[in-house]
C-alpha cells in the first residue's frame, strides 16, 4: 500500500545502506541525503547501484495529499543494462518494450513528475517528463518493425544489427513517449526516425532510410521515406511509393540529361552540374537549330 509520510516529523539523515529491496528491484550501496518534512521526503544526490549500472536521484516523494501521492525526480543514469531495465521496470515494459530485444547498456538523464498508485507505482497516464539516452554499442534482433524495414529494402542482414553512438531525446506527455528526430547507423545504412509510442504499445513513427551504393540498383533512389504504425507486437511498415517514384523519375531524367549533354559535346566537368547541363543543353540545341536553318536558307 501507500507509504504515508508523517506530517509531524521533521528530520534529515545521511543514508548509507548496503542493500534495499523494492518490488522487483534491488538497490545496492545506496547513499545520499534524505530530508523528511511536511509529509514529503526529499532525496538529495541519492546514489545507488541497480540494473547493472548506477543511478543518482534528486527529487521528492510526497503524500501531502494522501489520496494523490506524487513523485517528482531527476535521474542520472550510467551504464544501465537494457534487458535488466525491461525486466525490473513495469514502466519500460509498457512504454518501451523494445528494450527486451536490445543488448548493451545506456546512459543519460530522465526528469519525471507523476502521480503514484496504491502500490507506489507511477500512474503512467499522469506522467510528464523529458530526457535523453545514449548508447555507444548496441545490438538488436527480433524487433518486428526492423525486420519489416529489412524486408522492404531487401537487406535481411539488417534484421540482426549493431548500432554505434546513438542518442535519443524524448518527452513524456498524455501517456505517450515522443522522440525528437534521431539517427541510427545500421552498417552502411542510415535511418532517421521521429514519432511516439503509447501506453497501449501503439507506434506512430515516420522516417527516412538512406541507402548505400552497396544496395545495388535500388540505391539509385538514394533515400526512402518510411512510416511505422501498428503496435510493437504487430507493426505496419510502409514505404512512400510516391517518394520512390519521384526519385526514380529524377534519377532517370538526370541520366538522360547527362547523356544528351555528352552527345552535344559538353565535357564531363560540365555535366556534373545538373542545372548547368540543362542550360548548356538548351544553348547547344538552339545553336544546332540555328545552324540547320542557316543551311536551309542558303
Where are these regions (language model features)?
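N-terminal leader/targeting segments and the immediate start of mature chains
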Residues: 1-8, 296
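Small-residue helix/turn framework positions
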Residues: 5-267
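Protein-protein interaction and targeting regions used for scaffolding, dimerization, and localization
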Residues: 242-298
Amino acid at each position: 500500500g501507500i507509504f504515508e509520510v508523517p506530517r509531524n516529523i521533521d528530520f534529515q539523515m545521511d543514508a548509507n545502506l548496503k542493500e534495499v529491496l523494492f518490488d522487483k528491484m534491488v538497490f545496492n550501496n545506496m547513499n545520499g541525503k534524505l530530508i523528511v518534512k511536511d509529509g514529503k521526503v526529499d532525496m538529495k544526490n541519492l546514489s545507488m547501484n541497480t540494473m547493472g549500472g548506477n543511478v543518482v536521484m534528486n527529487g521528492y516523494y510526497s503524500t501531502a495529499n494522501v489520496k494523490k501521492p506524487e513523485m517528482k525526480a531527476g535521474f542520472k543514469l550510467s551504464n544501465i543494462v537494457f534487458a535488466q531495465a525491461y525486466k525490473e521496470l513495469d514502466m519500460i515494459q509498457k512504454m518501451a518494450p523494445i528494450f527486451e530485444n536490445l543488448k548493451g547498456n545506456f546512459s543519460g538523464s530522465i526528469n519525471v513528475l507523476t502521480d503514484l498508485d496504491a502500490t507506489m507505482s507511477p500512474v503512467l497516464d499522469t506522467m510528464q517528463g523529458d530526457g535523453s539516452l545514449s548508447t555507444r554499442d548496441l545490438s538488436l534482433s527480433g524487433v518486428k518493425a526492423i525486420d519489416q524495414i529489412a524486408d522492404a529494402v531487401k537487406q535481411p542482414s539488417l534484421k540482426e544489427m549493431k548500432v554505434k553512438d546513438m542518442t535519443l531525446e524524448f518527452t513524456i506527455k498524455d501517456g505517450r513517449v515522443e522522440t525528437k528526430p534521431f539517427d541510427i547507423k545500421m552498417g552502411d545504412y542510415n535511418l532517421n526516425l521521429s514519432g511516439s509510442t503509447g501506453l497501449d504499445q501503439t507506434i506512430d513513427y515516420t522516417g527516412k532510410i538512406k541507402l548505400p551504393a552497396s544496395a545495388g540498383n535500388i540505391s539509385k533512389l538514394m533515400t526512402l521515406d518510411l512510416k511505422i504504425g501498428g503496435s510493437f507486437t504487430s507493426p505496419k511498415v510502409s514505404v512512400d511509393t510516391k517518394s520512390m517514384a519521384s526519385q526514380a523519375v529524377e534519377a532517370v531524367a538526370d541520366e538522360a540529361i547527362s547523356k544528351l549533354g555528352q552527345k552535344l559535346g559538353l565535357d564531363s566537368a560540365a555535366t556534373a552540374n545538373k542545372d548547368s547541363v540543362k542550360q548548356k543543353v538548351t544553348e547547344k540545341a538552339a545553336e544546332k537549330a540555328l545552324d540547320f536553318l542557316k543551311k536551309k536558307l542558303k
